[in-house]
Amino acid sequence: MMGQFEQLDQMLTAQEGMLRTSQVVSSGISKPVFYDYVRSRDLDRVAHGIYLSKDSWVDAMYLLHLRFEQAVFSHETALFFHDLTDREPIEYTVTVKTGCNPSKMKAEGIQVFTIKADLHDVGLTTVKTPFGHTVPVYDMERTICDLLRSRSRIEIQTFQGALKAYARRKDKNLRALMQYAGMFKVEKILRQYLEVLL
C-alpha cells in the first residue's frame, strides 16, 4: 500500500500538484487506493476526475482543456496567446465542433463558437499557458478568419488592432491566411481590410 502512495506522491510532484483519475488507473493503481490517497493527502476535487494539491496553482486554461478536450482556444483568447492584443481576455473563448453541447461551458462563463467538423482542425496548433502546460489553440491566420467570420460578436477595434499587429509580424503567413479565408468564406472582406493595411 505504502509503495503505491509513494508512487502517487511522485506522480503528483511530476504533474505539478494535479492528478487525474484516468491517468492514475492507467498506471496500474486502483480507484479505491487512489481515493484513499486523495483523502489522506487532502486533495481538492476541482472537476470530474481531476484533483489538485492544496499548494498548487490552478491553471484555469489547462483545466478547461482537460475537462473539454475537443474545445480549442480561439478568437480573443487566441489573440492573447499570439500577442495580437494587449487586452487579457476577461472570459475564455473556445471553438467546438457543431453538435457538441456547449451548455456546460456557457454556464461557466466561457464564450463558445461552433464550426462544422471538417473545419475544426484547420490551423490547429498548441501553445504553452503561463503555467507551462500545453493547450490547443488556433494559429494567427485561422484566428483572423475566425474574427471575421464571427464579426457580429466581436468588437471592431479588437479585430482592427489584431490585423494591424498581424501585418507587422515577421512570422505572418499571408498564403495560409488567404487559403483559410477561402475555406471560411471571408476572402472578399479580408482583402478589403488588407488593401488598406499592406
Segments from the language model and where they lie:
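Basic amphipathic alpha-helical segments that dock to polyanions
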Residues: 36-41
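Short, Lys/Arg-enriched anionic-surface-contact patches
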Residues: 1-4
